[in-house]
Structures are given as C-alpha cells and as structure tokens.
Design a protein with these regions (language model features):
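Membrane-interface junctions at transmembrane-helix termini in multi-pass inner-membrane proteins
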Residues: 164-194, 209
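Alpha-helical transmembrane segments
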Residues: 175-183, 231-248, 275-276
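Transmembrane helical elements of multi-pass membrane transporters/channels
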Residues: 1, 17-98, 259
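Short alpha-helical transmembrane segments in multi-pass integral membrane proteins
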Residues: 1-9, 15, 26, 118-138, ...
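Membrane-interface helix-loop junctions in multi-pass transport and translocation proteins
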Residues: 1, 196-228, 239-243, 267-287, ...
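Specific pore-lining/lateral-gate transmembrane helices of multi-pass inner-membrane transport
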Residues: 73-163, 167
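Membrane-proximal transmembrane or re-entrant/amphipathic helices at the cytosolic face
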Residues: 265-325
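Alpha-helical transmembrane segments of multi-pass membrane transporters
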Residues: 187-212, 222-233, 257-267, 292-301
Length: 325
C-alpha cells in the first residue's frame, strides 16, 4: 500500500464527488446498507431462538412427550443436528455471496441481460452443489451422527429431516442475497418477517402431528413460502429465465436421486461387513459412501454436461481424460 500510495491518491482525487458528504451522512449510508444484511443473515439464529423459546412450552400442550423428553429432543435437533448441518448451510452462503459483487455491478449500470444471466447461473450453481450435499448428508446421517455423538436413532432421524430443511434454508439465503445485491432490502426484510410469522403459526400444528420433527418441518414451510415471495419479486424485477432454472433443478434432482441409490446400497453393504457404532468405523463408512456418491454424481453430470454449464468449460478436460463423449 505504501508503494502504491501515489496511485491510490490519484484515483481518490479522480473519484471525488462533486458535492462533499458529511461524516454523519456517510455513517447513515453505511448503516442503511449494512443493517439489512446483518438482520437477514441472522435468520438462522432467529429461527433457532424461536425453537428454543417455544418448543418446551408447547411440548406438554401439543405432544405426548414429558418435559424431560422435550429437553432431550431440543438438544437433538436444536444443537446436535444443527451443528452438523451448518457444514452444508455454509455452502449455500458461500455460493450466494460469490455472485454478489458481479450482480450488484451489472444491476447498478442497468445491464438487464447480464443480471438475468447471473441470477439464473447462481441459482443453477446453488442447486448443483446444495441439493446433492443435502441428499448425501441425509444418506450418511447415521454414521456421521455417530462420528460426532453417541449412536441415537432419534438423533439420526432428526438429522435427516434437518438435511431436507437445508435445501429450503439455502434457497432462502440465496434469494435474500440476490435481493440485497439489487438494493431490495425492504423485500428481504419482509421475507424474514413472513418466515417468522409462518414459523410461529405452523409450529404447534407440526409438533402435534410430527412430534420432535415438527419444528424442522415448520421451518422448512416458512423458508419455502418466503422464498416463493422473494422469487416472485425477483422474477418481476428482472425477468430471469425461470424455465432454465427449473430445468437445471430437475437435472440435479435426478442425478442426486441416482447418487442416493448408489450411496444407500454402499452404506447397506458396509453395515453388513462391520458395525458403524464406533467413531472410527463410522468415519470410514462416511468416507467410503461419500466417495461412491461423489463419483456417481460427478459421472452423471459429466455425461449430461451439466457440470460444464455450472462449473465452466475446464471441466471438459476431466471428461476427455475419462474418455466420455
């Protein structure tokens, strides 16, 4: 920075605004842009707080569980499973934030065609990575739970449901970032408000019918409805190619289904050979099943060239090495 100090000063002189901005005006602008980001990115924590504050109060009213059983359930899905799925959720956040500068730059100069392209590609990339990651984690939920905690069928079941919720949560996060990169902060905050309201309304009913999995399903419904609201607004604002996005989601879901089948068969075979209750054996099972799953998904998406569309033309080199057309 010291070496380039002169050049930076010249750039600052050239970029000086025609009218001076006061210190408080700058602070206000920073707060106006930053606060919505902080609020919306806290959605995961807000939903977790709702579960922590309401679940045990609702347990004796809407379920047949005792107070102690309620405490155990909230530990299983609110803490144990939540820590594991954060690995997958971080993928959604990294995908969403990667396109922010590019999308904001094109939107600021009113380049509508590039805005539509970036949004469609970002959603396609989200599906390409997030859906198989969530499906894969659901398949290996038993051994991966055993790696971190003591074997528990209920904990494994709640982890599977949490993995399903990850997809809806990831979509919610992706659309909030898309909206905020286009300065649609109010819409993103409204979507968060809808999420909280729907979560509170659905929580008792889902707990009554589904017990411990109820809060997770309520969260999934809330995130899904809020995502539809945001998607409608983004579609109206940019007219991005929704058919293209849905087509990519369909291709990813089919490839993920094939991956799930091969992974489940592999896990079944491993369980016939050795028990996976111990942490080391569970870790070996996760690694082997993960390897089979990644290979299956990778080969399918290379074959139908979905990988090329999502990850770039350089992926074609892998296909040539594998002698795939």
């Amino acid at each position: 920075m010291f070496r380039d100090h002169k050049g930076m000063m010249e750039l600052m002189e050239e970029g000086r605004p025609e009218r001076p901005l006061s210190f408080w005006k700058i602070i206000f602008e920073v707060m106006r842009e930053a606060l919505p980001f902080v609020l919306v990115t806290s959605s995961i924590q807000i939903i977790s707080l709702i579960d922590q504050e309401t679940f045990q109060r609702f347990v004796p009213i809407f379920t047949t569980y005792s107070f102690e059983e309620g405490k155990e359930l909230i530990t299983l899905f609110g803490f144990n499973a939540n820590k594991i799925i954060m690995i997958v959720i971080s993928l959604a956040m990294s995908i969403s934030t990667a396109a922010l500068p590019l999308l904001a730059a094109h939107y600021s100069v009113n380049d509508r065609e590039e805005v539509k392209r970036v949004i469609a590609n970002n959603l396609g990339l989200f599906a390409y990575i997030m859906i198989p990651a969530s499906v894969g984690m659901a398949i290996v939920s038993e051994p991966i739970y055993n790696v971190f905690y003591s074997p528990d069928p209920t904990g494994t079941y709640l982890l599977i449901v949490s993995c399903i919720m990850c997809v809806f949560l990831g979509l919610f996060v992706t659309f909030t970032y898309i909206l905020q990169s286009m300065e649609q902060h109010i819409i993103a905050i409204k979507a968060l408000g809808f999420t909280v309201i729907i979560k509170l309304l659905w929580q008792p009913m889902m707990m009554y019918f589904l017990g411990g999995a109820g809060p997770l399903i309520a969260s999934s419904v809330a995130f899904f409805v809020a995502t539809l609201y945001m998607c409608r607004h983004v579609l109206r604002l940019t007219r991005f190619d929704l058919n293209y996005v849905l087509k990519k989601f369909g291709q990813v879901i089919l490839a993920s289904f094939a991956m799930a089948v091969t992974s489940a068969i592999t896990l079944f075979a491993i369980k016939q050979i050795m028990p996976i209750g111990g942490k080391v054996r569970a870790l070996i099972a996760v690694a082997l099943v993960g390897l089979v799953g990644v290979a299956t998904y990778g080969l399918i998406t290379l074959k139908n060239r979905l990988a090329d569309e999502m990850l770039g033309a350089r992926i074609g080199g892998i296909r040539r090495k594998l002698r795939m057309k």
